[in-house]
Amino acid sequence: MNHFSKKVSVSLMALVMVAMTASAGTNAAKSTKTSGVNWNPVMDAIIQVESEGNPNAVSGKSVGAMQITPILVKDCNDILKKQKSKKRYTMADRYSVSKSKEMFLIIQKHYNPENDVEKAIRLWNGGVKYSQRSTNSYYKKVLAQMK
């Protein structure tokens, strides 16, 4: 497959994923939905790419199934504080898959209100100021896991 065909295939796959997640619905767990999007397929793919599903994975300052950093925990807590929520996450919560998924949803709701699947994946890998180029490989790996 040539380079152009690969790009078209990835783009089409991304569009299909957006359509599928946007229409996924009523059977999805309430805690994994924001504005009608079922984030479970994205989160599950990220978990496979980040840690192969290992909730005890450690790589530098990143830990848990979703490889959460202390900076992300602080960011989630800052967002919750601004929302006047009393809920806060601890560093130990990074080892909990369910709490890691909650943090993912907080980040997406705050930084990705349009619920763009591609942005969600790139944002998770590269942070708020991610670049397209630096997150390309990661984005492709997550999409491949979502097949």
Which residues fall in each region the model found?
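N-terminal secretory targeting signals
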Residues: 1-41, 140, 144-147
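Extracellular/periplasmic catalytic domains that process cell-envelope and extracellular macromolecules
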Residues: 36-39, 59, 114-117
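Short, functionally critical alpha-helical segments immediately adjacent to catalytic or ligand/cofactor-binding
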Residues: 38-54, 68, 104, 119-127
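Residues that flank catalytic or metal-binding motifs in active/ligand-binding sites
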Residues: 42, 61-64, 138
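Short N-proximal segments of mature Sec-exported proteins
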Residues: 50, 58-75
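Short helix-to-loop capping/linker segments positioned immediately adjacent to catalytic or ligand/cofactor-binding
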Residues: 54-55, 111
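Short, solvent-exposed loop/turn and secondary-structure capping segments
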Residues: 57-59, 134-135
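Alpha-helical segment that forms one wall of the substrate-binding/catalytic cleft
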Residues: 70-123, 128-131, 139-147
